[in-house]
């Protein structure tokens, strides 16, 4: 890996619930992609209204244990938030591109191997 220099850039952010608060599209959101280096849980907390209002919502997100923990999130709480909001969670198998229900996957192995996986979370209708 060698010596790598990283530059940090501060950017403004806004919660999606706030951004869409007066929008006629707030209940017409059907897809969200998140790859925000461990801040996914914080983003979900800022879109609880969107999660509740949009019955056809699908979210594609990374699940990276170390990144979540570095951001102060318990990975189990991240998954629980999806389940509490009535989402089915699938792991995207990178080799076959199949969707595997999360209950068929050994999450503890993913955690111990420190893997980064992609999840497809689809609202149950």
Residue ranges: model-predicted function:
Residues 30-34, 60-62, 120-122:
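Short beta-strand segments
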Residues 1-54, 67-73, 77:
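Short internal loop-to-helix segment that lines adenine-nucleotide cofactor pockets
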Residues 56-58, 88:
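Proline-centered loop/turn at the N-terminus of a beta-strand
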Residues 9-11, 59, 119:
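Structural detector for hydrophobic anchor residues on beta-strands
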Residues 14, 62, 92-94:
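Conserved beta-strand termini and adjacent loop/short-helix elements that scaffold enzyme active sites
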Residues 2-3, 7, 69-125:
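Rossmann-like AdoMet/SAM-dependent catalytic core
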Residues 22, 57, 64, 95-97, ...:
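Amphipathic, alpha-helical segments enriched in basic
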Residues 38, 63-65, 123-125:
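Non-catalytic surface loops within mature trypsin-like serine protease
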